[in-house]
Amino acid sequence: MLSMQQVYRFGPAPEHPARHLFVFLHASGADARSMIPAAFKYQGRFPSAALVVPSGFARYGKDLRSDKCGQQWFSTSGLTDENRMARICAILPRIEQLIRREQTNHRVPAERTVLIGYSQGGTVALEAVKAFPELAGAVVAYAARFARLPQPGTRMDSRIHLVHGGYDSVVSRVYAERAARALAGLHVPVTLDIIEDLGHALTHEAICRGSLRLLQGIYERRRATLH
């Protein structure tokens, strides 16, 4: 069942024009509001970033008519490794449309756009930049995985920052480790942070780790252009 999509937008600090666009994608069963605290923490480190926090495309829960049910980007009902990729591919054009629209509205180019996703939202972010190489300059994916690892010859222009809990029992750290190896083999800039005592959660420490990696990546890219 589809739902009306709600999108929260927050501009940069008043004295800062929007130099970056950060799009936050929530976990399955949550909603856009669940990512707003993380969005504000990121803006504390990046005051010139415009924040966009959309809700998933479909409702999640047993009573889909209830206003209290959560949202999801693609259905998890009957989800398997065999059908996961097809379900994601079905919604990727809408993800691209959403991000392109926000880039136009905020006048921020793709190379200064960052997708920040948790769990299902992180998977959608990873698959989006795999499908559309020029969609965003970076991805920060928390407790997430590729539906299908990038294969030899895959073009990916985004910097990828993976943050994962060492004790994640929902999405095993093995997925993040495999993703990091595959990306490194494609010469894609990638970082992997395993927080050993963390389960499947988006904590303050994880947010700080991801935002720091993002800041370091932006600095390194700027430094490279000066040489």
Question: Which residues make up each language-model segment?
Answer:
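Serine-hydrolase catalytic machinery in alpha/beta-hydrolase-like enzymes
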Residues: 2-108
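Short beta-strand immediately N-terminal to the catalytic nucleophile in serine-hydrolase-like folds
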Residues: 115-117, 142, 163
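Alpha/beta-hydrolase fold nucleophile elbow
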Residues: 107-117
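Short beta-strand/loop motif that positions the catalytic acidic residue
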Residues: 161-164, 168
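Conserved alpha/beta-hydrolase "acid-adjacent" motif
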Residues: 34, 169-175
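Gly/Ala-rich beta-loop-alpha elbow adjacent to hydrolase catalytic centers
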Residues: 116-121, 125
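C-terminal catalytic histidine-bearing segment of alpha/beta-hydrolase fold enzymes
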Residues: 174-227
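A conserved short beta-strand
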Residues: 134-146
